[in-house]
Amino acid sequence: VIIGHRGAPGYRPEHTLASYELAFRMGVDWVDVDLVPTKDGQLVARHEPEIGGTTDVAKHPEFANRKKTVVLDGVTTTGWFTQDFTLAELKTLRAVERIPQNRPHNTLYNGRYRIASYQEVLDLTTRLGRELHRTLGTYPEVKHSTFFQSIGNPTEPKLVAILRRNGLDRPDAPAIIQSFEVSNLIALHQQVRTPLLQLTSATGAPADFVAKGDKRTYADLVTPQGLRDVAKYAKYLGPDKAQVIPRDKNDNLGTPTALVADAHKAGLKVQPYTFRNENPFLPANLRSSAEPDAYGDVFTEEAAFFAAGVDGFFADQPDTALESLHAFLGR
């Protein structure tokens, strides 16, 4: 399974309807939709609540007084935050490319697309599914769960309501809920029948563990016992790709860990993140040059992960990833 990570952000500004539509038309059946809440209780597709880096909000003088500093999961962040805007206000903004140094061509599309609500993404998914005669789905991700609970604007009840309203509260739904936190997924497992995916990072610990003084880290979640615990509430594991195949001291691809085998033994499917074609994101020996916007040999990287037994992965260039998949399957 290839999941369009934030749509197809190798080609269009991330998390826009244009990015999702392109991903589906390229051939993936799934897109990853990060969700954060608005002031009026809507869910919008953004990677984090701070929108200065992915929209033109700084050019809107009417919102200048909304700029503030927030401590987000222990990190001090200054900017503009979705929870301080209504959906209607967010709709007056336009998306811009997050990493123009790596994706200068995407700046062509700056200012063309609005911020999308999750409902709009679901509507697009349904419409394109009918047109393309395929079952298309989303991987909604609850971002910064503990933070939004702490300010009284939790994402989870809103997500549950949207899933139910759209007939997605079922085990075979074309939706898979993701989170880097644990307690919210355990709670969601009791509330909905939609499948769950536990995300893990190569470093650090889940924000809910840190907030509660739980000393466990992401490394503890991916031990054989940790994976058995995850499998009690989740069907999928979404590790950092470095947890599947770490880089060596020269930043080249190393040897696969036992993670895939251990996760499969626990009954989990493994879908790591994130595959990107541009040089800075690739292992050193697969880079074509020092140019930050040039492509390197991502096919070799992706082939190594298929050989390691993963069940799919998240990719910024879905067309490239699908080509890797077809090569692996011998099509």
Region locations from a protein language model:
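Phosphate-group recognition and catalysis centered on beta-loop-alpha active-site segments
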Residues: 1-331
